[in-house]
């Protein structure tokens, strides 16, 4: 392939896919399937179920398959090609991450975004590329899923996840769960391990402050909700928050023709420095999980307090509009509605709005999710066993699940729900235990490899009797016995009762 010449996209991808197949063959990957089949009441038990087929779920599935664990399924409630936030509620123009990060490539060069991009557009265009366009990243993930032939079941919602007395995990699914679809059916599957690859929402969901509860839903939204921005043309729109999503939603409203957008920020100044970027290294990726608990808390508390800044591009995208207004040191002190008009009070003024968007992040309270109700009371949180220093309070961190080294939940009461050890939390809620390896692009491959290796080890241990029996039964000889004779036997000097090894 000429590194400086654009190829026809289809031809370029075809060549790249051939290279990937060759790379995998040279590495003898995927490994042959090795996990003994298990059935229950005549039903084949899945070795691994992954809930969520976004970037984290796909990467985990790919690594499991490379390790020879192919009796697996991914379930995602989104239609095919719409998994994750990238073309739903993510509203930035480009990714924040630098374009050269290898992301979910699992140390396979031909699986990187760069390889995918250059195969279609050439190296010169890669060099000219500023950052990865958001929609193009989704195109890459669709290709990733296809080229690895990952077993995703779309339009499928998990209605209930519960453990059984035999140690298996039962999932009640609603298939065909597209909004408005009448062609739905329920199905129950059994799994030995379940991975919750549920992204930024983690175990909880969108966080909206209590002050907003009385505002009718048609007048407000969370930044992760579907929003009809075209309907906001000429309207007065407010956005609460200083995150990247706050600016992206403000920009989306402005670009759709909003008459005025007011951005309300609690802080007196926008954060300017992404502190965790300053210590990004393999040491952080592989060392965080081994830190003492007090240091884990200290690192993430400081990161939360300093807060990652919105990307400069996102801020400039909003600031370019004359009808955009930034209000610093402006927490909401009052919020009410008068008919279809919202009245916002801050220490610096009163504002009337037609629509209000809360870019206020997510919470990790597992007991707010109906599908997790059977296991939620048993899940140990950090608050159940760890007390931070008095000057370092943080309720979001305190509600994080207290995971083991395998990303698995731990029991609040030992012995009450032992199957939790096979339910793995591979999403944002894992950050306090494992670091930022279960959802962000920079270290997603490292996290997926850690998870998949842990599951492989657990499956082997659980089937050790079967593997030992296979060890004993194995009888493929490598020597025929006629390669070289015993000199002492030929001389007749070996005692007849000499034991064989």
Q: What is each PLM-predicted segment?
A:
Residues 78-106, 270-287:
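Conserved N-terminal glycine-rich FAD pyrophosphate-binding loop of Rossmann-like flavoproteins
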Residues 86, 98-100, 106, 124-128, ...:
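A short alpha-helix-loop-beta-strand transition element characteristic
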Residues 103-138:
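A conserved beta-strand/loop capping segment in the N-terminal third of enzymes
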Residues 82-89, 116, 143, 366:
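Tryptophan-centered motif/residue detector
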């Amino acid at each position: 392939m000429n590194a400086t010449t654009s190829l026809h996209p289809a031809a370029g991808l075809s060549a790249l896919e051939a290279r990937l197949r060759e790379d995998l063959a040279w590495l003898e990957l995927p490994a042959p399937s090795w996990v003994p089949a298990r059935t229950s009441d005549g039903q084949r038990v899945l070795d691994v179920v992954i809930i969520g087929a976004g970037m984290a779920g796909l990467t985990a599935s790919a690594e499991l398959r490379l390790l020879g664990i192919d009796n697996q399924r991914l379930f995602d409630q989104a239609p095919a090609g719409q998994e994750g936030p990238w073309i739903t509620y993510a509203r930035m123009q480009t990714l924040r991450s630098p374009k050269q990060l290898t992301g979910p490539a699992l140390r396979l060069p031909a699986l990187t975004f760069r390889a995918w991009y250059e195969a279609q557009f050439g190296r010169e265009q890669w060099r000219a590329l500023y950052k990865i366009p958001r929609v193009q990243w989704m195109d890459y993930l669709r290709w990733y899923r296809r080229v690895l032939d990952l077993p995703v079941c779309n339009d499928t919602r998990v209605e209930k996840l519960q453990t059984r007395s035999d140690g298996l995990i039962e999932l009640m699914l609603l298939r065909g769960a597209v909004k408005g679809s009448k062609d739905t059916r329920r199905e129950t599957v059994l799994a030995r391990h379940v991975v919750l690859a549920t992204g930024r929402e983690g175990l909880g969901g969108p966080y909206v402050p209590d002050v907003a509860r009385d505002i009718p839903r048609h007048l407000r939204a969370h930044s992760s909700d579907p929003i009809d921005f075209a309907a906001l043309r000429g309207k007065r729109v407010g956005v609460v928050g200083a995150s990247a999503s706050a600016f992206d939603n403000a920009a989306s409203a402005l670009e759709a023709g909003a008459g005025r957008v007011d951005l309300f920020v609690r802080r007196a100044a926008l954060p300017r420095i992404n502190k965790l970027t300053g210590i990004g290294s393999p040491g952080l990726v592989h060392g965080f999980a081994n830190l003492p608990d007090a240091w884990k808390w200290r690192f993430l508390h400081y990161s939360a307090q300093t807060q990652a800044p919105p990307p400069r591009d996102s801020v400039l995208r909003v600031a370019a509009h004359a009808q955009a207004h930034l209000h610093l040191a402006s927490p909401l002190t009052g919020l009410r509605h008068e008919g279809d008009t919202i009245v916002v009070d801050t220490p610096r003024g009163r504002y009337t709005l037609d629509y209000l968007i809360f870019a206020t992040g997510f919470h990790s309270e597992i007991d707010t999710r109906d599908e997790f109700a059977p296991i939620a009371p048993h899940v140990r949180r950090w608050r159940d066993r760890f007390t931070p220093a008095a000057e370092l309070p943080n309720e979001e961190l305190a509600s994080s699940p207290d995971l083991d080294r395998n990303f698995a939940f731990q029991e609040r009461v030992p012995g009450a729900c032992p199957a939790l050890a096979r339910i793995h939390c591979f999403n944002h809620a894992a950050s306090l235990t494992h670091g930022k390896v279960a959802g962000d692009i920079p270290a997603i491959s490292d996290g997926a490899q850690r998870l998949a290796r842990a599951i492989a080890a657990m499956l082997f241990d659980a089937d050790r009797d079967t593997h030992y029996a296979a060890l004993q039964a194995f009888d493929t000889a490598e020597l025929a016995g006629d390669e070289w004779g015993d000199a002492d036997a030929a001389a007749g000097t070996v005692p007849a009762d000499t034991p064989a090894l």
